[in-house]
Design a protein with these regions (language model features):
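Active-site-flanking segments in enzyme catalytic domains
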Residues: 1-272
Length: 272
């Protein structure tokens, strides 16, 4: 993980240079736990408001429309890096030294897998055939291309569209991870395309975790470029009631308390 918040010691760790979106998100977690008393980490009316949002058919329509636009962006970025990957690896395949390295890598992989699977008591000839078909030069190149495309697409999204990623995860939290797991359906029962997000397994843990992610994502949106536009997009999707609950909690319960802490420090000449 490039950037994460440790809630046992309230420290944000940045392991390597990371995207601003990640840093602002994890700092949002820290502010949430630092500024708000444990018993007030979730608004008292959170469950009721979220329930109304989920039951509102207009919200689902807004989510589906947003996801369609989001997918256009990600698909265009993926296609750009797919074309780049094709060119890079086509050039590599014309390099004799690179081809030799691939063959050596594949040979080592095949030997490792033979050793790993020998206890399955598969006849040696059959095992060799299975493993050799799994680890071909073509599959190795395709795998490297997929890694290149996925990593660069994610990096590009976090750098230039971090606010949209945060919106996706807020929606994912509201629908308990169904969006990112591809299980959210529209009024006609058709699946809505999946987006980034923490997923069902994470969001089924408890309400505090879910709301903490909503606040952390909101904090990231506020700090990132195009904040005003992205906040309006979020408001149009989740509705005024849900948006106001998040915004009021962030501005009043978190930032207000944090300012009071700073004022307290100032009144003591910078010392506690």
């Amino acid at each position: 993980c490039k950037c994460f918040f440790n809630d046992t010691n309230n420290v944000v760790y940045l392991t390597i240079p990371s995207a601003s979106e990640l840093l602002f998100h994890e700092t949002g977690h820290a502010l949430h736990l630092y500024s708000v008393p444990p018993m007030l980490l979730v608004p008292f009316d959170y469950a009721e408001i979220v329930k109304r949002v989920r039951q509102n058919p207009k919200t689902l329509i807004a989510v589906e429309n947003f996801v369609k636009e989001y997918k256009k962006i990600t698909d265009n970025i993926e296609e750009k890096f797919r074309q780049k990957a094709d060119k890079i690896y086509d050039d590599f395949l014309n390099d004799k030294e690179y081809r030799k390295r691939i063959k050596k890598t594949l040979s080592n992989l095949i030997d490792d897998k033979k050793e790993k699977y020998k206890d399955l008591q598969i006849p040696e000839k059959q095992l060799n055939m299975i493993i050799s078909e799994m680890y071909t030069e073509e599959e190795y190149i395709n795998c490297q291309k997929r890694i290149f495309i996925n990593e660069n697409t994610e990096s590009n999204m976090r750098t230039y569209y971090g606010g949209l990623l945060a919106i996706c995860d807020i929606i994912d939290a509201i629908y308990e991870g169904k969006l990112s797991n591809g299980l959210l359906v529209n009024a006609q029962g058709k699946k809505i395309d999946s987006t980034s997000g923490h997923g069902i397994q994470y969001y089924h843990r408890n309400v505090k975790i879910t709301f903490s992610e909503i606040i952390a994502n909101f904090a990231a949106i506020v700090k990132l470029p195009d904040a005003e536009e992205n906040l309006q997009i979020l408001k149009n999707i989740v509705g005024e009631e849900m948006y106001n609950m998040i915004n009021n909690f962030y501005c009043q319960d978190i930032l207000k308390l944090h300012i009071e802490e700073l004022d307290g420090i100032k009144s003591y000449g910078g010392k506690r």
